[in-house]
Amino acid sequence: MPSIEAVNLTKQYGVFTALSDLNLKIEGTKCVGFLGPNGSGKTTTLKMFTDLIKPTKGQALINGVNVHTQKKKALNSVGTLIETPEIYPSLTPKEALTMIAEIRGIPSDERKKRVEEALDEVHMEKWINKRVGKFSKGMKQRVCIASALISDPAIVLLDEPTTGLDPRGMNEVREIIKSLKGKNRLIFMSSHILSEVSDVCDEVAIIDHGKLIVYDTLPKVTAKFSGGNNVVEVALLRPVDNKVVAKSIASLPDVISAQKIDDKNLKIIFSGGLDVQERLLNDIVKLKIGIISYKAASSELEEVYLKLITATL
């Protein structure tokens, strides 16, 4: 089971503390969002997990191995994208990734296969022999993510992977990250975009002023800090009748209220945890109203986030 763990991880620059006694253990194949405002310590943490900077004290462990004393062993199963590198515009994805594969120590007889597989994962196989200089920012970012996947890692560390992208590029990268979750990987992704974390991640760790505030599943975090209730948004294939919302959905067990956001989107407030959320989804599917997506509402995470961040000021 892949794991990353911070044990009393601290980084000081003179009198300034960038990270303070961070204790965080993440295990299993899932996507965890590392959420916090700019300057909160997110990038500092990721850089210590990749040995780009040394901690003042504490340990950064990957699969139980100390990154700073056994770097090669610890990072052997890790792919990283920290501070997005610029790929030479004259290179093709194939050329750039082949060089990275060589640097990573991938045997020469395996490089071609790994390059093709990594580009396929980010849906860039059609551009394998095109010059990077002609790519959009989103396409370049997908190639950079492919570079993190070149060794087929069990753990992927991403530092704000959608920063600087237009809405289309952001959506493309988020969809790629979602697809990576289904391939038995642990993804630890920093972000300051609440809707992104809500859409992509299974769990969230919130940090501010170098200190961890909370780490749990999204439903548990929103329930714990928003009065014990959870909110889900449901997208439908076709418009739903008001009577169905009022009678069939609002009357389901543990549902506090159900209302239409618009003709094809619903907001449902319910009490309970993941087990209730699972049952609620099954109950709604049985109504045969054309459900096409079901997710925690980002507005609830925003409310919790602002409440927690304000409390640390």
Stretch-by-stretch model annotation:
Residues V65-H68, K72, L212, P239, ...:
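Short, surface-exposed acidic/glycine-rich loop or hinge patches that mediate macromolecular interfaces
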Residues V78, I177, F225, L308-I309:
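Hydrophobic aliphatic residues
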Residues R174-K267, S271:
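ABC transporter nucleotide-binding domain
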Residues V7-L9, A258, Y294:
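Generic beta-strand hydrophobic packing signal
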Residues A18, E196, D241, V276, ...:
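Short phosphate-engaging motifs
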Residues P2-A6, K11-M189, L194-V214:
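ABC transporter nucleotide-binding domains
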Residues G28, K126, L236-R238, G272, ...:
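Non-catalytic surface loops within mature trypsin-like serine protease
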Residues F270-L313:
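C-terminal coupling/interaction segments
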